[in-house]
From Swiss-Prot:
HAMAP family: RNA_methyltr_E
Underlying gene: rlmE
Cited PANTHER family: RIBOSOMAL RNA METHYLTRANSFERASE (PTHR10920), RRNA METHYLTRANSFERASE 2, MITOCHONDRIAL (PTHR10920:SF18)
Enzyme Commission number(s) of this protein: 2.1.1.166
Protein name as it appears in the record: Ribosomal RNA large subunit methyltransferase E
Length: 224
């Protein structure tokens, strides 16, 4: 009974934080599906990553807030006060997730497990022989609470995003990947530094204070 009471208190506290969250309110006002859009927005505004005409691959895309943000950046006219982007899409956005995603106008969505070769082949087919300008990875595993197992799962997903970027991204392109502080963090930073000419670590203001997430941004591939 005590555990149930504790759990309900935790759930109520989370719900209270969520309802009163500035970014949750802003997302509703501006028509984004999740507050995560503002994490990418800050990273983009800091580094100037997203430009019209690009090919952007969004890994771990559901519910679609990052794809929505990219979609708006690739329109000749951006919507104000919420709603969808205005005007034709100038660029290509391919989103992928193991979970379903409600359509985002102009975005190609593939549902499947990025770890499976046939899903990767579908993604390559949608790229039509082009290399990506930008790869986004908001992929995160289901965490077990066992540090060593969770670290391995996190590291595996980021390694897959790194491998994809090395093989399918322009040399001058960029990779944005979500990582978590813990046993996998330092090895992943090392891998990024081995792979990219410049590496930035950003914890956006929209990341919750209690969250251990950080985003690694790799700019420009080193020859391999």
């Amino acid at each position: 009974m005590k555990s149930q009471t504790k759990s309900s208190k935790v759930n109520r506290a989370w719900l209270n934080d969520h309802v009163n969250d500035t970014y949750v309110k802003l997302a509703k006002l501006e028509g984004y599906r999740a507050r995560a859009a503002y994490k990418l927005k800050e990273i983009d505004e800091t580094l100037g990553l997203i430009k019209p005409g690009q090919l952007v691959v969004d890994l771990g895309s559901t519910p679609g807030a990052w794809s929505q943000y990219v979609r708006r950046k690739m329109s000749p006219k951006t919507a104000t006060g919420g709603g969808a982007a205005v005007g034709a899409l100038n660029g290509t956005i391919i989103a992928l997730d193991i979970l379903p995603m409600e359509p985002v106008e102009g975005v190609v969505f593939l549902q499947g497990d990025f770890r499976e070769s046939d899903v990767l082949l579908q993604l390559e087919a949608e790229m039509k022989g082009r290399q990506a300008d930008l790869v986004l990875s908001d992929m995160a595993p289901n965490l077990s609470g066992i540090d060593s197992a969770d670290a391995a799962r996190i590291e595996n997903l980021v390694e897959l995003a790194l491998e994809f970027a090395q093989n399918h991204m322009k040399p001058e392109g960029a990779l944005v990947a979500k990582v978590f502080h813990g046993a996998s963090y330092d090895p992943l930073v090392k891998r990024f530094k081995e792979t990219f000419l410049l590496v930035k670590r950003i914890k956006p203001k929209a990341s919750r204070d209690k969250s251990s997430e950080t985003f690694l941004v790799g700019l420009g591939l080193k020859p391999h």
